[in-house]
Structure formats: C-alpha cells, structure tokens
C-alpha cells in the first residue's frame, strides 16, 4: 500500500491546543501514516513572528513530546531565509521518492490566496492539498484558484491512489483558539493556561515572550 505523509505548516507563534488537535484529527480522519508539523522560518505571506524561529521550534518540540502520533520537521527553520512551501515539498519528494503520497494541509484562508504563492502551479505536481474549511472564509467564485479546484477536487480515498495531484476539502472540528488571541492575552498580563500545553506556557514565561 502507498505510504502517506501529512504536512501541517505554519508559524506556530505560539503552538496551541487548536493546532495540535487539528493535526491529530487530520491524521486520523485521512488515515495517514504520519503527520509532521513544519514551522516556517520567515513566513512569506504574513507579518513577522513575535518569537524567533528557534523559540517557536522549541515550543513545538515541547508540545509534541506528549503526542507520539505527531512529529516535527525543521527544514524551513534550518534554511534561515524566507520559507516557500514548494521548496519544502521538492526536498521531501526527493527524500521520500515518487511513491509516497505527500498531503499538504492548509486552511481555506490560505488556499483562497494560493495564486500569490511562490511557484504555486507546481504544488500539485509534488503533493496533494487538503483544504480545511474555516468559518468566515470561502474560495473565490472565479479566478485561477477556483479553476484549480474544479480541475483537481477529489475524495479522501484518492490520497492513497496517487502520490500527488488532488485537492480534498474537509470540515474537521476546529477549536476556537488563535495564536493572535494568545499573544494578546499574554501582552495584557493574563494567562493562556489550557489554551497551550503547560510545557509551552512555562517556556513562554521563562523566555518572557509576547510581553
């Protein structure tokens, strides 16, 4: 049977319970063999993070210590330059070979602007895309992203039939937690306990992050 690997990229500034639950639910719902969380160094399409790449990677490692079903991929942090998904997928394809099904997971908000990504037309030559429905966001009714979806939309079962090339839309359970709100809580002197893993909250306190 074709091996499958899920990839969940993000800034993770900081990693929180919502990230972890979503990654685990995607792995289980799609019946993936593995799921890697892949923090970016410098996000190409977002504001600069409040914590350094090293600090965000450390928080992610602390969070995943209690979840053996999830793992971390630090290739984008190690690049020490702007992160482009197409570069990471190209590296993974070279490492894992042509048979492994790569499944890159992203939100509706990110997918809606996919045509602004670096070399976006190459993404489906390297991986499948799983688009996670997010409340308040929708895919444009016209334009290149809508055309791409119409040409490549498929069912979850197709993720094992080919190594790349399909777009699957999913509406998993989403916890209403955001990294922005967590940073705002900390900045206001309040505790984000139970929104982030205890080990992450302890590290944030030690490093005096987001104050």
UniProtKB/Swiss-Prot annotation:
It holds the Pfam family CTP_transf_like. One of its GO terms (molecular function) is ATP binding. InterPro entries: Cyt_trans-like, NadD/NMNAT, Rossmann-like_a/b/a_fold. It catalyses: nicotinate beta-D-ribonucleotide + ATP + H(+) = deamido-NAD(+) + diphosphate. Keywords: ATP-binding, NAD, Nucleotide-binding, Nucleotidyltransferase, Pyridine nucleotide biosynthesis, Transferase. Pathway: Cofactor biosynthesis; NAD(+) biosynthesis; deamido-NAD(+) from nicotinate D-ribonucleotide: step 1/1. Transmembrane segments: none annotated. GO terms for biological process: NAD biosynthetic process. Its EC number is 2.7.7.18. It comes from the Bacteria. It is an enzyme of class 2 (transferase). The keyword Metal-binding does not apply. HAMAP family: NaMN_adenylyltr. Catalyzes the reversible adenylation of nicotinate mononucleotide (NaMN) to nicotinic acid adenine dinucleotide (NaAD). Belongs to the NadD family. This is Probable nicotinate-nucleotide adenylyltransferase. It comes from Cellvibrio japonicus (strain Ueda107) (Pseudomonas fluorescens subsp. cellulosa). The lineage of its organism: Bacteria, Pseudomonadati, Pseudomonadota, Gammaproteobacteria, Cellvibrionales.
């Amino acid at each position: 049977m074709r091996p499958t690997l899920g990839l969940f990229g993000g800034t993770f500034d900081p990693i929180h319970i919502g990230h972890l639950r979503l990654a685990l639910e995607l792995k289980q719902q799609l019946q993936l063999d593995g799921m890697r969380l892949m923090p970016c160094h410098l996000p190409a399409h977002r504001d600069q993070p409040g914590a350094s790449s090293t600090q965000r990677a450390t928080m992610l490692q602390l969070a995943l210590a209690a979840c053996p079903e999830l793992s971390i991929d630090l290739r984008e942090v190690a690049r020490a330059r702007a992160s482009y998904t197409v570069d990471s997928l190209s590296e993974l394809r070279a490492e894992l070979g042509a048979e492994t099904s790569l499944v890159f997971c992203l939100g509706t908000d990110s997918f809606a602007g996919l045509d602004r990504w670096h070399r976006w037309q190459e993404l489906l030559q390297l991986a499948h895309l799983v688009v996670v429905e997010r409340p308040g966001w929708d895919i444009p009714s016209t334009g290149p992203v809508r055309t791409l979806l119409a040409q490549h939309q498929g069912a979850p079962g197709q993720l094992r039939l080919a190594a790349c090339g399909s777009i699957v839309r999913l509406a998993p359970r989403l916890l209403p937690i955001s990294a922005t709100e967590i940073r705002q809580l900390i900045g206001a002197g309040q505790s984000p306990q139970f929104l982030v893993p205890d080990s992450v909250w302890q590290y944030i306190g030690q490093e005096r992050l987001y104050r």
